Amino acid sequence: MTFGLDTSVVLRLLTGQPQDLAAKALERYQDGIAAGDDFSVSDLVAAESYYAIRHHYGKTKEEALGALKSFSAGDGISFSQNFAVAINTPNIHKASPGFVDRMLASDYGERGQITISCEKSFRRLPDTEVIS
């Protein structure tokens, strides 16, 4: 079976905090893997986790993105193609547009839509229109 992970679970697995919930989340994940289950992480959960790691746990962009990238390589974990496009951008921690904006633009592009933004940095991405 495939289960979708909520941001609260992803944060426990990535940060180990609070310890009691993190231990329970890890046990559930490990039990699921042992049973042959898969776990999915949506783009929204990836974005929320990124911002939470940065702002509530005081990590740098590079640390937060590194944690998400490492987690995405875990057994039984799947993220979207949009996540893969964004997280594998060279020097994503310094990129403009950044991680979440790239996931968003990739998602719209996957749907055959053009992204409209007021941010000039979107000009660097395909299939975008910038209002300025």
What does each of the following model-derived ranges do?
Residues 1-41, 56-63:
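Short, well-structured N-terminal submotif of metal-dependent ribonuclease cores
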Residues 105-132:
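Acidic, PIN/NYN-like endoribonuclease modules and their adjacent C-terminal/linker elements
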Residues 50-54, 90:
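Amphipathic alpha-helical segments within well-ordered protein domains
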Residues 12-14, 52, 125:
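Residues that scaffold the ATP/ADP-binding catalytic core of kinase and kinase-like folds
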Residues 5-6, 41-42, 97-101, 119-120, ...:
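Histidine- and aromatic-rich ligand-binding microenvironments
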Residues 76-114:
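Active-site neighborhoods of divalent-metal-dependent phosphate/nucleic-acid chemistry enzymes
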Residues 10, 46, 122-123:
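A generic structural signal for short hydrophobic patches within well-formed alpha-helices
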